[in-house]
């Protein structure tokens, strides 16, 4: 624990020369509002918001370039509260600064329908750049924002001197001990150093207290040394009241352009709560009426009043609105001058901000003739990306060290990064479009979210479907935010073969489909893959993330695939030859991905027994379920109860479509190490097995 002598030193104020009494009053107002808000609702996290009051005030009122009247301003600095549990750290600044929150919003913290939920939520509260709460995600996504900022500079103003472009700005982060403990921040911080992201400035609130009290029980490392080892520019500031040290550290960080900056700020959580500061009780619970009253007495507030804000304090802090507009106007002059110099790049920016695709963008998408050589859908996806590359400069992405397997490299594209990281295989350029995440799947997921949130480019990242498990927290958060991230997940079943059960996805398709707002797209062949990419890129403005599920093994190019059908999520690929117009089939075979070919072959076997089968390709259940009832009933007539679903994964998500009388050809156990043909045969993924299931469904 921190000694009383250390607490005294850490809480000794150091203010710059232009700091006034009203600045101190504003900081104390933040502390009291945080204590009052949590006390009123009865739960929450007051301590960090209290001890970080000087830092938050300094960032929002004295450092960051932003305009409270336009929270979407292209030239703004971004702020990420990775320590999302301390949401009041952000909310109170948004209130004081005039971003759209009022005192009543602070009073309604964590209540139904309020603008101030327990953790900050993107799209919900003006001024919130990203949903945070699951620790580590914010810092990792901020790395993506910093990468996006550089890539966008390359698209729009590549030749400007550092700091001279209207597209230059900073990404500021506040991270906690918990953020630092999470593995995703280690992954992302390592990559940030590789990328030399000089526009990223992270404040680490080193208060050494968590829910279980003193973090020494679980965190003993020299975190600053760890970040130095990564290659970050590292500074240490003693004391959360040390505004002079905070501002000096910010200035130093801004001057370092070839490395991200890490500022370890030693604070005393809950200061100035006399009995609970520097304890776990200040972290995640209301302080209690007596302790809140004691805090108010210490800072000169009336202990019998709640939510006190002096009029002169609010007038002072709301002055940020005018200052922000002035900064915006100065920036606008620079932006307008750039627009006159760069009319073509300005047109590109306008198109991206309008979320439009260029005319003819999909005219050169590859097409494969039915019956041509079998092709893995991952290979088809790679061909599609290379065709799209010249038309869509906003499209960029890569892989978690599996580019050759995922086929995620756009042909001819340089790698993104400082030239110094170039290898024999890859030429890096500051503004390249091929991303190398390394074996950092979790960070990749969070970084993609940061890129998309920063806007306005489109980013994708690839790995094996099995390793989507490593990405799941970031994927869920992207779905919660309804942002348009793209995940390319290949090697999608036991069909990957010899790598064996550790790498063969079994439960993954159903597990991913369980995430609300995530679209899981598993095309049947090369053409469906092209149609899927077309649909994914045409979906914008909060359509939600998409996981594109692709095969390792070759699959035949099928007859009858349909672009509109793919966009609708499911469609009739083939009806039995003897079926008359308007006549319903005897049985419906529903399949996805590499198993659609089995349904087509089973249709022929069933026809030999005078059973008329319909084959439905269902690349995306989520898109299909969003269609009108009329369309869904036309594809899957309710009167046809004999149904079979075929997918090389667990059956869990298919019962809703096949019903109690239907059959599911699935795999409910882990695989083995063997070639894909052997595995499909031994585990019952054959045309004969599908036909037999159809006959059972007819008998049910």
UniProtKB/Swiss-Prot annotation:
Active site: 441 (proton donor)
EC number in record: 2.2.1.1
Disulfide linkage: none
Residues that, per the record, bind thiamine diphosphate: 48, 85, 133-135, 178, 207, 283, 467
Pfam families: Transket_pyr (PF02779), Transketolase_C_1 (PF22613), Transketolase_N (PF00456)
Keywords, alphabetical: Calcium, Magnesium, Metal-binding, Thiamine pyrophosphate, Transferase
Site label Important for catalytic activity, positions: 45, 283
Residues binding Mg(2+): 177, 207, 209
Enzymatic reactions: D-sedoheptulose 7-phosphate + D-glyceraldehyde 3-phosphate = aldehydo-D-ribose 5-phosphate + D-xylulose 5-phosphate
Binding site for substrate: 45, 283, 378, 405, 491, 499, 552
InterPro entries recorded: THDP-binding, Transketo_C/PFOR_II, Transketolase-like_C_2, Transketolase-like_Pyr-bd, Transketolase_bac-like, Transketolase_BS, Transketolase_CS, Transketolase_fam
Coiled-coil segments on the chain, per record: none
Cofactor(s), names only, from the UniProt record: Mg(2+); Ca(2+); Mn(2+); Co(2+)
GO BP annotations listed: pentose-phosphate shunt
One of the record's GO cellular component terms: cytosol
Gene Ontology MF terms in the entry: magnesium ion binding; transketolase activity
Signal sequence extent: none
Major enzyme class: transferase
Cofactor, how bound (note): Binds 1 Mg(2+) ion per subunit. Can also utilize other divalent metal cations, such as Ca(2+), Mn(2+) and Co(2+).
Function: Catalyzes the transfer of a two-carbon ketol group from a ketose donor to an aldose acceptor, via a covalent intermediate with the cofactor thiamine pyrophosphate.
Subunit structure comment from the entry: Homodimer.
Family: Belongs to the transketolase family.
PANTHER family listed in its UniProt record: TRANSKETOLASE, TRANSKETOLASE 1-RELATED
NCBIfam families reported in the protein's UniProt record: tktlase_bact
Protein name: Transketolase
Gene from which the chain derives: tkt
